[in-house]
């Protein structure tokens, strides 16, 4: 769901549509929700990726794997992941603070409409690049896009220059038939990577070190990881340049 889809909020029930409307009202650019589960396929992929040493010196990725693959072990009692996206802005401000500020505002609205018990009172449940959680994969689970050949989340209309943030809540969410269940964009997002990116390899060709080796990313070669900030694989992406 994006800002253009905001509808009037009245007689709120805990549906994905109402949650997303609240997220858009507080200032996010897109929102989706997904039921908590263990991401078995991603766990298998990550374990193999780490075993090959492709994570470089990011040893933290090899820790807390149970929590990383299943948010219910990170926040006991969590049943739903709310994922929000904020557009990238080149202002120099710390996006973590901006995203978390909006998440806390959204949390207050959720408590107001659905009760204090909607979130854990004893465990941290708001995240923005701050916990062992597979953020990009949960964006996909929530219907907010797909993982492109540049290994970034790509939203079908916002592109990949977005910052994700999450709230884990303790209640199940009623799926909306009008939004295709939990995955609002499911009809607009193609079903496989070949359809997503087709024959486009611009990001792979733009990478100055060859770090993008489909279907894996080699952090040891990535300029953004080894030396300095780099967005070459994103700025070249047609989803970020729709014209």
Predicted regions and their residues:
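Auxiliary alpha/beta "docking" domains used to position bulky ligands
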Residues: 2-196, 224, 243
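Iron-sulfur cluster-binding cysteine motifs and their immediate structural context
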Residues: 38, 201-223, 227-243
């Amino acid at each position: 769901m994006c800002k253009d889809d905001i509808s009037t909020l009245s007689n709120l029930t805990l549906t994905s549509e109402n949650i997303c409307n609240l997220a858009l009202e507080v200032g996010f650019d897109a929102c989706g929700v997904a039921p908590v589960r263990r991401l078995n396929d991603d766990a298998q992929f990550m374990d193999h990726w780490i075993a090959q040493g492709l994570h470089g010196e990011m040893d933290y990725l090899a820790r807390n794997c149970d929590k990383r693959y299943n948010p219910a072990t990170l926040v006991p009692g969590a049943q739903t992941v709310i994922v929000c996206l904020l557009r990238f802005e080149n202002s120099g401000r710390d996006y973590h603070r901006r995203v978390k500020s909006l998440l806390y505002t959204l949390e207050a609205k959720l408590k107001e409409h659905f009760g204090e018990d909607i979130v854990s009172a004893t465990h941290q449940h708001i995240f923005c690049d701050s916990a062992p959680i597979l953020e990009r994969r949960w964006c996909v689970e929530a219907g907010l896009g797909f993982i492109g050949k540049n290994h970034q989340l790509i939203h079908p209309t916002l592109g990949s220059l977005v910052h994700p943030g999450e709230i884990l809540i303790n209640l199940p969410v009623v799926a909306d038939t009008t939004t295709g269940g939990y995955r609002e964009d499911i009809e607009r997002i193609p079903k496989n990577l070949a359809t997503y990116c087709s024959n486009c390899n611009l990001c792979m060709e733009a990478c100055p070190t060859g770090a993008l080796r489909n279907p894996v990313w080699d952090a040891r070669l990535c300029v953004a990881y080894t030396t300095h900030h780099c967005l070459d694989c994103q700025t070249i992406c047609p989803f970020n340049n729709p014209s």
